[in-house]
Amino acid sequence: MSDFDSNPFADPDLNNPFKDPSVTQVTRNVPPGLDEYNPFSDSRTPPPGGVKMPNVPNTQPAIMKPTEEHPAYTQITKEHALAQAELLKRQEELERKAAELDRREREMQNLSQHGRKNNWPPLPSNFPVGPCFYQDFSVDIPVEFQKTVKLMYYLWMFHAVTLFLNIFGCLAWFCVDSSRAVDFGLSILWFLLFTPCSFVCWYRPLYGAFRSDSSFRFFVFFFVYICQFAVHVLQAAGFHNWGNCGWISSLTGLNKNIPVGIMMIIIAALFTASAVISLVMFKKVHGLYRTTGASFEKAQQEFATGVMSNKTVQTAAANAASTAATSAAQNAFKGNQM
């Protein structure tokens, strides 16, 4: 009966509770696939829970992460520290050089007042023979050449010690082979001859050359030192009846007696080391000689000046001139009488 009382032109869904807007809005918000989801169907069907949740904005405060680069003030501090260390190093070097110059000046003043006293070889005061030379690297030799001159001095000492050991090597060889008396005698002679002669003939000229920048002394050193190098090579070879425990003599002694042969081989190695070091130092001294400005012309001038300024040469020349003048006058007088 109510159907007949209703308005035929009214909306039929007006009184439908399922058509209410609030209900239809909720049903539209249901995730898709919820009605079609079947847990027993193919696993490739996405589950209803696979809906992406909306991104929640981060409410934490922004924090800046530190970078790997150091701040500018840190680099400036490091550069300042390096510059300060370099300045301190230079200052210490300058102070050391100033102290060295001050010490050398005081020593020169003492030498000018009291004179230079010989101090080499260092002998005791009660020894009957006194020192023959004056030697002080810090006073006589410039700083840039002191190391080279000291090495040459140590090389001379090394060769002297080798010659001294050579005496014992030849003595041991003579004990196992009585025909080696000549080698033992010559070994003593070489020690007594080469030790002082090498010091006077090539080391002292080298010392004086660097002390006074003398071209003439450099040439004397080069000439004598070449001969010294040849002697080192011959001693390392060790020919029979030459008084040297070289390689040839060592092999011969090794056939006679093994301990004696080993002793001689050690001495031969020392002679070989002397020859090699001599060659190396010769090249080094020659390189320094080329930087000093020395030349053969300067050596000739120094030789002529030294000869003419030598009192002994002057006296001999004056005596020769007076003798020649006297003989010429006598011959002229005799010629006039005739």
From Swiss-Prot:
The modification Phosphothreonine is found at residue 45. InterPro entries: SCAMP. Keywords: Acetylation, Endosome, Golgi apparatus, Membrane, Phosphoprotein, Protein transport, Transmembrane, Transmembrane helix, Transport. Its main location: Golgi. It is found in: Golgi apparatus, trans-Golgi network membrane; Recycling endosome membrane. One of its GO terms (biological process) is endocytosis. Residues 1-64 are annotated as: Disordered. It is a multi-pass membrane protein. One of its GO terms (cellular component) is synapse. Residues 2-155, 203-217, 283-338 are cytoplasmic. It comes from the Eukaryota. Residues 177-181, 239-261 are lumenal. The chain crosses the membrane at residues 156-176, 182-202, 218-238, 262-282. Belongs to the SCAMP family. Interacts with SLC9A7. Interacts with SYNRG and ITSN1. Functions in post-Golgi recycling pathways. Acts as a recycling carrier to the cell surface. This is Secretory carrier-associated membrane protein 1.
